[in-house]
Amino acid sequence: DDLPPLYDEHENDAVPFIDPLAPTTGPGAGGLTIEPFKRDARSDTVYYLDPRLDSDPKFLNDTLVQLAQLPPRPFAQIRGTHTETRRRSDDKTEQVTVVDFDIEIELTHLLYVNIRDPVNGAWRQLHSVGNLEKVRRGTVFPTRAPGFGGSGGIIENGEPSVEEWCHRFCASRAGLKNMVFERRVTGWDWDYLKKQLERLVHDTNYRGHTSITFPVRNSRVEIYNACRVNRMRLTKWIEVMFMLTLLFVFAWPYLFFRTKRWETVYAEWAMSRDEPDGTGCVERRYASMSEAQWYQMWARAIQKAVLERRQGHLDQGDVERADQPADQAGGFAGMVQAGVEAMGVVNRSFGWGGDS
């Protein structure tokens, strides 16, 4: 199997980053024709505010199709911490959380059957929610569709399509409107992988607190109707001013109850799917590799990074170095690697990372 590519951070580049995974042909070709109004790094959400998005259902639908072509960015994050009791200068004690290791591995490439073909090389599909799903449907609070456990409105005759939801959003007379679009990653057993990684860390005799998570970045988009109130709520300095003057105490309830929200459209990116095997049965096929295959590829590199107390991203170079004996590294690098491996043996023997 091909090793995953190196990834760079482009979020803060002065030159706009051109996504190599954005399609150049097909439904999403040419990219978005509008720029985001705001990018919130804290919540990893991109906000759009354009009058065409809340008045032209075809333009809104085309924009959602284009947004669906851009991939989410799933990660595996392995983090270990312990607490230490330290004595301060005033002779009092305090508990401090110490990070022993914090490593991330990007999984975006595993969404593609052929990463060189962004149009047809991935199993992605634009969906609308089902009638039984409890989401906001132009409402303030989540609800099921009318006739399926939800109250009010005309009973749904079938499940509304993406195009229908675009028409309903644009036709709504609500003064404040918001449509949430999500990119979801499916097709892997995350619970299985979490247990495998927890066991891997435990095998190093680590005695601290382990956290295994699978965050998905570049997954959330919010579209607001173009009006002065929404421009103000998305402007950072106004938000800060409202916090400092405590005006948010009055503004937050107003915005919450006045804003009608739609959480009815999402893009599904499948890492695996069931396909007929030609004998009348169904078999699971993976876009790139299975959870077990990925674990076998990365297990040694992850365990080595944990013992080295690494913090940061791992890439294909770590996979290659993990399979390289220390005596092959040569020179000073080989001496350092041998020393680190010796420390790892000691840690495994006596345990490490416990609270104190």
List each language-model region with its residue ranges.
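Short amphipathic alpha-helical segments
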Residues: 350-356
